[in-house]
UniProtKB/Swiss-Prot annotation:
This function is generally fulfilled by the C-terminal part of HisG, which is missing in some bacteria such as this one. This is ATP phosphoribosyltransferase regulatory subunit. Coiled coil: none annotated. One of its GO terms (cellular component) is cytoplasm. Heteromultimer composed of HisG and HisZ subunits. Keywords: Amino-acid biosynthesis, Cytoplasm, Histidine biosynthesis. The gene is hisZ. InterPro entries: aa-tRNA-synth_II, aa-tRNA-synth_II/BPL/LPL, HisRS-like_core, HisRS/HisZ, HisZ. Gene3D superfamilies: Bira Bifunctional Protein, Domain 2. It comes from Dehalococcoides mccartyi (strain ATCC BAA-2266 / KCTC 15142 / 195) (Dehalococcoides ethenogenes (strain 195)). Pathway: Amino-acid biosynthesis; L-histidine biosynthesis; L-histidine from 5-phospho-alpha-D-ribose 1-diphosphate: step 1/9.
Length: 412
């Protein structure tokens, strides 16, 4: 038997039903907020992710890359490891005339995991707002994400906020190289005891500030003001990012959005330049995003600010209750026929489908338990409609009467 690749998943019919349900809720929310759907190719040039330094070396080690063979001049391409960078490239290539662009998409991303225990292909629902700076745009994205999760039936969604420049401002005093800053930050989050002991011994004031930022949590702008006061001179240039952060949470306060400030939740801040947010449902990380004002100019585009987020479909799918999808799932009708009535059966099925109801031809082996009704075409003027749940059969003489019953237009 040939097995599927390690780290890859098959999405079965029930999974895809949930997939489309989540996607439809997200898409409907985006459209009502003024976002327009786009789609980027699965293949992108590797240079899109390397020339601008938008991904860390650690992340680049996890991309699937290969040669796009074209004689001896082929370029190296990758299976996209990220959704935002291709969306930014799409804007630069096609939509620069738009002063403000609101874009949304569904995309799969690919990241190698040598253990095979983590998923190598992940589906994301993404939204980006390009050309708008400031806390109001950040709040719009956060509210859109929360609205989508609420419409999916999730209550008590946890919103965690961080700011990419806060940790960077402190780490810059320790290591000027940005890639090394990412590595050190990840080591600190992973609880690297040796690194923490070294920092405490060699740079005690810096270590104290890092602990202050990473261990304390708050739920208001006052918390951030206290951080500024407690960090003191050892905090480096924290004033500007803290003021930006305070402005952001002030907007959320006005909108009545609950949040937790968790400065240690900024892991993976490769191209982010401001506020970062993460979304959790029952402890499961289901989405996140932030501001990336330098990404578009880094990719060769205009100096446009931008921000965005992604919801993680693979993590949301198993969390959706089948009962939540009843409004989406249409009742299925089974179509049978007797004798030489195949054409009449097709006509009956098409009429039912025109009413927006699923109609399927019966074949031996079909499990009738999955259907609510069965229509048996006995002749052009003879039909039997069976309620498979109540086990009750009614006879009709024309198609219109059958349609009236199945569509609920009138009682039979």
């Amino acid at each position: 038997m040939i097995a599927r690749c390690k780290g890859c998943s098959d999405l079965l019919p029930e999974d895809m039903l949930r997939f489309r349900y989540i996607e439809s809720i997200f898409h409907d929310s985006c459209i009502t907020w003024g976002y327009e759907e786009v789609r980027t190719p699965m293949l992108e040039y590797l240079s899109l992710f390397t020339s601008s330094g938008t991904l860390t070396p650690q992340m680049l080690k996890r991309v699937y890359s290969f040669l796009d063979w074209d004689g001896w001049s082929g370029e190296r391409v990758v299976l996209r490891p990220d959704g935002t960078i291709p969306a930014a490239r799409l804007y630069i290539d096609n939509l620069q005339e738009m002063e403000v662009a609101r874009l949304c998409y569904t995309s799969n991303i690919f990241r190698f995991d040598e253990t095979g225990k983590k998923s190598r292909e992940n589906w994301q629902l993404g939204a980006e707002i390009i050309g708008v700076t400031g806390s109001e745009a950040n709040a719009e994205l956060i509210t859109l994400a929360l609205e989508t999760l609420s419409r999916l039936g999730f209550e008590d969604v946890e919103l965690r906020l961080s700011h990419s420049q806060l940790i960077k401002a402190v780490l810059a005093q320790l290591e000027p190289n940005a890639d090394e800053q990412h590595k050190i930050f990840d080591q600190l989050l992973d609880g690297d005891v040796a690194l923490m002991s070294r920092l405490e011994a060699e740079k005690p004031e810096l270590f104290r500030t890092l602990k202050l930022l990473m261990e304390n949590k708050g739920t208001s702008a006052a918390f951030l003001k206290n951080v500024m006061a407690m960090a003191g001179a050892a905090g480096g240039d924290l004033e500007e990012p803290l003021n930006d952060f305070i402005a952001g949470v002030d907007v959320l306060d006005k909108l009545g959005v609950s949040y937790q400030i968790d400065l240690a939740s900024g892991k993976g801040f490769e191209y982010y330049t401001g506020v970062i947010f993460h979304l959790f449902v029952n402890g499961e990380h289901v989405g996140g995003g932030g501001r990336y004002d330098k990404l578009i100019p880094l990719l060769g585009g205009p100096d446009k600010p931008a921000a965005g987020f992604a919801l993680y479909l693979n993590r949301l799918i198993p969390m959706i209750d089948a009962e939540d999808m009843y409004d989406m799932v249409e009742e299925k009708i089974l179509i049978k026929y007797e004798g030489d009535n195949l054409k009449n059966a097709y006509e009956m099925a098409n009429l039912i489908r025109e009413c927006g109801i699923s109609a399927e031809l019966f074949y031996p082996g079909v499990d009738t338990a999955a259907y609510g009704w069965a229509v048996t075409v006995k002749a052009a003027d003879s039909y039997e409609v069976t309620d498979l749940i109540e086990d009750k059969t009614t006879e009709f003489k024309n198609q219109a009467e059958v349609i009236c019953l199945l569509s609920g237009e009138e009682d039979a």
